[in-house]
């Protein structure tokens, strides 16, 4: 979940929240075919303001589109529409949690395992859902084949932070 993106565009924020949770689980060795999502949503009090009503609608549409694009469905969630106190409002918030059942032999962790291991950055050709799904499929295949010893998804943190965390480990 990226609060800065969600404040600017609730649709994009929710879409990216789903993408990030799916990518993290793929990087951990789980397959999208076995994944499910659950959401936690927080929004300002809607009152009678049509613009306020549009924020949760946009977020839900973004999350729905991501589910369709990545073939992963949500099985539940919890929402709060009372995220306001006097003049303070929470940013539009849709947090996505991904879970899956998988084979323990496929589970990977992000820390680098040994000196001399090859480090590879895999990136999508573009931001189209088909390109993202092809990248997920390739990662699922490489992890299943035992080629990947460590794997991490960079998400909003960026590549540099992800590499430092992989190098430092637990």
PLM features: residue spans?
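Glycine/proline-enriched, intrinsically flexible loops and inter-domain linkers
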Residues: 1-170
């Amino acid at each position: 979940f990226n609060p800065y993106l969600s404040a600017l565009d609730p649709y994009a924020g929710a879409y990216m929240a789903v993408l990030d949770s799916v990518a993290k689980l793929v990087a951990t060795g789980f397959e999208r075919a076995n994944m499910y999502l659950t959401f936690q949503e927080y929004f300002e009090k809607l009152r009678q303001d049509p613009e306020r009503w549009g924020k949760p609608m946009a977020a839900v549409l973004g999350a729905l589109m991501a589910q369709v694009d990545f073939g992963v469905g949500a099985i539940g969630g919890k929402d709060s529409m009372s995220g306001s106190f006097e003049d303070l409002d929470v940013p539009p918030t849709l947090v996505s949690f991904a879970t899956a059942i998988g084979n323990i032999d496929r589970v990977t962790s992000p820390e680098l395992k040994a000196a001399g291991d090859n480090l590879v950055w895999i990136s999508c050709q573009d931001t189209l859902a088909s390109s993202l799904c092809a990248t997920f499929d390739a990662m699922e295949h490489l992890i299943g084949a035992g080629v990947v010893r460590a794997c991490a998804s960079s998400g909003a943190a960026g590549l540099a932070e992800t590499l430092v965390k992989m190098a430092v480990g637990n």
